[in-house]
Amino acid sequence: NPKKIILSFEYLGYKFTVSDPYKKFDTNFRIVDVDIATTKANKYKKRISRAFYDFAKTNDWNLLKDRIKFLTGNFQVFNPHINKTKLAGIFYNYPEVQNDAKNLKELDHYLRRIVLAKHGRLAILLRPLLTSKMKRELLINSFIKGHSDKKFIHFSQSRISQIKKCWKY
């Protein structure tokens, strides 16, 4: 029995889906699922794609690895305006998202599809560049794990600038 969705909306980077419970007599409360907003998930997908296109141009393996770790993990960022570091990343930007959220799963599938693709423009560019070992190394990264385990990585401020460079538009 699928849940009957009553309301779905996006607000402040989140997607809220309100539905009736499976069985009416189980509970009087509606179910509220909290996910990353589809617009935000699409932004992550665009960044994943741009990271791979940049790799196809530069062949900088370490930068590609760091970009995927950056997207799927959590990190510290120094904010010069308040002279403090703040936590950011897939968990710290979306702490209210449930670990089994649909868009987190979709981001993992998207990354997997790009890494393992056999057809398409990006696949043609990546095929001669990515070895099986490299693919395995990339597929260790996961949005779900980064969120649920609060996986933390450390980058210098200059490395973060390099990582973000291909996403500027």
Regions found by a protein language model. Give the residues of each.
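Active-site palm subdomain of RNA-directed nucleic acid polymerases
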Residues: N1
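Active-site and adjacent loop segments of nucleotide-processing enzymes
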Residues: I6-Y169
